[in-house]
Amino acid sequence: TYYAQKTHTRGKGVELANIETPLVVEEIHTEYLRAGAQAIKTNTFAANCSVYQGDTALVERILRSGWEIAARAAEPFDAYVFADIGPVTGLPPADILDEYRFLVDTFLAAGARHFLFETNSSTEGLVETAAHIKQVCPEAFVLTSFSAFPGGYTRDGFFVEELIRTVAESGYIDAVGFNCVSGVQPMKELVHLLGKCPLPLSLMPNAGHPIVIDGRTFYESAPDYFGDGLAAIVRDGVSIVGGCCGTTPEHIRALCAALADGGHMSEGASAQAER
């Protein structure tokens, strides 16, 4: 959403910008880092062969370029870089596993050691892929994030407690969390609904409620409201906080200020992630 806002583009895979306008992508990463982000995600959320119509060579170029851009931007800030992988859907189960393995192997070869699987509605392929990552690179850090409606159920009809228990019991996932679908307040209610989490918990809510103007989606939310609300959730034991759709550098700056002004990251906290 921030890329579309800055470039006034729409309807084209944003991941292609890693190849076509890499300096713009690097500039956006840098804006979030200057705002205080301690971690960034590669611009690769939908970079897979299901979305890009089986073009393996193109997807590999997007992934490698996305990693290089993010790593270059993060280096002066000593920030973490997470290889960002969205859901792989629309394929037979065996093909989904093969696609995930292709994605993570490409990232591993590029140097990735932190992985974010986000916006998931089920655990399909996730545990097996995390196991593969750990087999190849035992020191890798794997974060799995689910998208759930305020009642605690995902788009595929799974209850969040069930999903988190499954990935936690696998032993291959280092942290779990929620992202997208909801704003700060509904996500806070999800945390209370979940109760005690067996793994470090990550939250990346949307900046606010979406509105559509002239075919483009915007998220109405004051950065201070976002920052103060998310910082308050940290006191409930959340370890990693950041933002999803609609989150601008100003939202991250407000979040960092709110954390410094009274929100205390729980033990093991390591990142504020951006989108």
Briefly describe each language-model feature range:
Residues T1-R275:
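Domain-level signal for soluble alpha/beta catalytic cores
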